[in-house]
Amino acid sequence: MDKNLWANTKFIDGRLIIDNGRRIRTLSMESWMEGVTKSYSYYKAPARERGTKMLKLDRKLWMYTPHTDRKILIAGHLLRQSMMGSDLSYEDMMEDEKISEAYTGRIDGEEEMEGMKTLVMTLQAKRKTKTYQMLKIWVDPIKKIVLKEEAYAKSGKLLKLIHFKEYRKVDNRLFPRKMIFRDMLKENTKTTYMFDEIRFDVDIPSKYFSQSILKR
């Protein structure tokens, strides 16, 4: 699974389609990621969000908004808050850690999903600091791709439900065209993350991971 989803560096041109139950809005952005400690995102649309930037370095995240012309540090428990009204937290959006390095797993059995036989696995976090202490995933055993994921708190409360859809081949990997997130602490909401373009193992200029990029 890691072989399909993870890379040393990654570039994404994508959209977040946020449905809060009353209206739908779309955010367009470009993101660059290096390992699990560095990522930078630039928001292109809509007009009111254009120029918004997010920079993650280790466990700290800075957000720059052009209408205030200042940057805000988001750290600690604030990383778990909803990002720009979506079903993703800031942590969800910026996290890119290998499953095998963050969790230990066991196979619970088989289950049919959408006419396909899947393996059901339970994953336990190796570190107490992980937001999601347990994951339950449904995996295509032949293609080794995740089809569905449930993310739980330490208490056992279901926090997030994620569906992985429309896998396609990208650089000898299978990667979903879209992921559908549902924050289970909200009602009647969902956020679809569309990957319009994704490139793996790309060269990323060092300036993208410097606070100096958080300027107008």
Predicted feature residues:
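Short, conserved active-site entrance elements at the starts or edges of catalytic domains
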Residues: S86-Q124
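Short, surface-exposed linear segments at secondary-structure transitions and domain or protein termini
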Residues: E34-S41, Q81-Y90, K169-R173, I198-K207
